Amino acid sequence: MKPISTIQWARLTLFVAALGMAANGPAQEAKRGSSYSPVVIKEDFATTMARMAAEKPVVMKRQMDLLNERYDLSDRPVPGVAMSRGKPVQGDVRVKLQAGTTWESLAAQTPEEIRAQGSWPAGFYPLPHPKQADGGMTFPRFVIDEIIKQEGRDLTRFDVDFDLPDLFLPEFPAGIYLTTRPDLGDVSQGKLVTLFNYYELFNGILNPKQLEGLRLLVTSFPQQQFNQTEDRRSVKPSRGVTCFDCHANGHTDATTHLVGDIRPQEHRHRIGTPTLRGVNVQRLFGSQRALKSVEDFTEFEQRAAYFDGDPVIATKKGANILERGSQVHSMAEFQALLDFPPAPKLGITGLLDPRKASKRELQGQALFMGKAQCATCHAPPYYTDNSMHNLKVERFFKPKMINGRLASADGPIKTFPLRGIKDSPPYLHDDRLLTLDDTVEFFNLVLELKLSATEKADLVAFMQAL
């Protein structure tokens, strides 16, 4: 047998290396996962539903255990403070601290010290979806019940329920205030606007184009979890969801979802549904997507967000492609009529009228514009700069897995308007902050402000007046 030459050894080495790369390539791809959801479902629907329904109690117990570990969920409304239609506003800091820790001692530490000690409050970590592994639209029970009552359309999921207590959610149904008819005040008549009553409520108040836009906003179309295929999370085939199922009465009912613009699943942020009030003064839409008009966002929602940003799945389940020049524009025109709720203590410039405001509210306003640095981003009169900012909260903690959500860097997030803020709890983009008191404590740490207890209370009082 002839000895193998140097050239032959080199060729053999390259061949073996190529085999190794071919073997490792698929393994690495499998480890990384795919951007796409499976289109062909191998399991029959009855088996899927039975399996997920059996898992549901475990899923919900894990999420509720997390909420109780993170928060004080008791009923403690703020005396004399209510939302626009009368629902009590919950007060006090609800995020729990580790034993032996105080807010003052935390505020005295640097981000590096808090990170090293692992003392970042549990309630300040990103809040996972109640079922992070699947995500998807998950509605509060009171929303589901009212839509069943009016339309017979069931938004119950057999695999998961909404998690946050009703105490900490916006009032339902919310008031509707129109920029074109401020003389009418709340035009909702205390009703949830649906396809079954929108015409009788708004005929004679809106023009025909706006009325058509509202009709489309309350018309259901297929969505990732609610559709007619075997890949759904409703017991029966579903007609889908409407824009106003989440943005109830043009406001928010706190329905949750996951952002569609991130992969893999453990990195996807929970979404707290934002209000549509005041979209006429906003120029950025989506917490991170930076869409530039409400027309863009309206079109994007049904083309992509309804289906987790997956156009392949959207084609299978029935994406509703809106026509830009008529349908999208009509929907956007109605949305642009949705005004902020009345704020009787604010003057023309969006600042407090000293003749109407309390001493505490005026002190809070001075802090908001000065020491607390709030107005750097949340500038009057609508308390937004129409921009995006990265708070870099990951300075304070090491990445960790929380119920399937990898808590790490969030990146830049849109500056949402604070006008009418008491009407739209919970707070932050993923609803991790249950009250305005929680929100002030969060930013006191993140911005390293070292505010006193009195200063923090003054800030809350000011925001309740917006």
Where in the sequence are the language-model features?
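Periplasmic c-type cytochrome electron-transfer domains
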Residues: 27-466
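Bacterial N-terminal signal peptides that target proteins for export
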Residues: 2-13
